[in-house]
A protein has these predicted regions:
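N-terminal capping/lid subdomain adjacent to the active-site entrance of alpha/beta enzymes
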Residues: 1-69, 75-79, 87-90, 114, ...
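Short, glycine-/Ser/Thr-/acidic-enriched flexible segments
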Residues: 21, 126, 150, 177, ...
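Catalytic core of soluble alpha/beta enzymes
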Residues: 46, 51-183
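Short, loop-centered acidic/histidine patches that primarily coordinate divalent metals
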Residues: 148, 173-175, 201-203, 221, ...
Length: 252
């Protein structure tokens, strides 16, 4: 049985997005966004930081119109920046991801009260109690679930179920996984609560040659189709792993 079916997944075809870092120029950012849109990706996430925020997002909106666009701040701001976030409401972004410190949900709740754009928590969510607290105090309206951070499939499903029952959208984040980790992210993203495009992309976007076959590919519709083969659904290229290994340990 495929892993995604074993987990109770319902969406075999999952929508994909990409994350684009801070560039040397806005023109370079435009080029990267266009490349990803041409590749079929449905949602564009751009990193924002002081000095690379309002004007950049404004130019991206002007050039690309109503694409699905979000900003990821990686905790780069404080409550002193409320006015900035209020100004950026005009761009109708999908969300601001982790705008404030990862360990201060109360500040996020304060910010969310002052802006219209949904806040998405990422680094703040390590467990179901974290998600419960964030939702209860109004610290976010969206959650980014990272499988490795929350402790595996069981915990991820518990969190996604909790969020789904409270109409809090969830999406799958990425942590620069190889094909094996990516296969697990794909399986997780088929769960019912995962309703927004996640950071699950094609193997070739990060790897010259992945350690699984076939490589993960994105369709022209900007989706990934979960495999029907048993387990993670991909064959592990052990010869490739052996070639790349720096050190090995045998347990048991």
């Amino acid at each position: 049985m495929p892993l995604w079916k074993h987990l109770g997944g319902v969406n075999r075809e999952i929508a994909c997005g990409v994350s684009i870092g801070i560039q040397d120029s806005v023109e370079q950012l435009f080029d990267k966004i266009q490349t990803e849109l041409d590749a079929g990706y449905r949602r564009i996430k751009i990193k924002i930081a002081p000095g690379w925020d309002y004007d950049v997002v404004k130019q991206v909106r002007k050039k690309f119109g109503r694409i699905l666009l979000m900003g990821d701040a990686n905790s780069a701001y404080t409550l002193n920046d409320i006015d900035l976030f209020q100004k950026m409401d005009e761009f109708k972004l999908m969300m601001f991801e982790q705008p404030l410190a990862y360990d201060d949900m109360f500040d996020h709740a304060k910010l969310q009260q002052e802006i219209k754009t949904p806040i998405c928590l990422d680094e703040s969510i390590h467990s179901l109690p974290d998600a419960r607290k964030a939702i209860k105090i109004g610290a976010c309206k969206i959650i980014n679930l990272k499988l490795g951070r929350v402790g595996g499939h069981k915990q991820a499903k518990r969190i996604s179920n909790y969020c789904r029952q409270r109409d809090i959208p969830v999406w799958s984040g990425g942590m620069l996984e190889s094909g094996i980790g990516r296969a697990h992210n794909i399986a997780m993203a088929t769960l019912e609560g995962f309703t927004l495009p996640g950071d699950v992309s094609a193997s070739k976007r990060y790897w010259h040659e992945d350690i699984i076959e076939p490589a993960v590919e994105v369709t022209k519709k900007g989706t990934i189709v979960a495999p029907e083969k048993p387990g993670i659904g991909f064959a592990i290229k052990r010869d490739r792993i052996d070639k790349l290994a720096v050190k090995t340990s045998v347990i048991g």
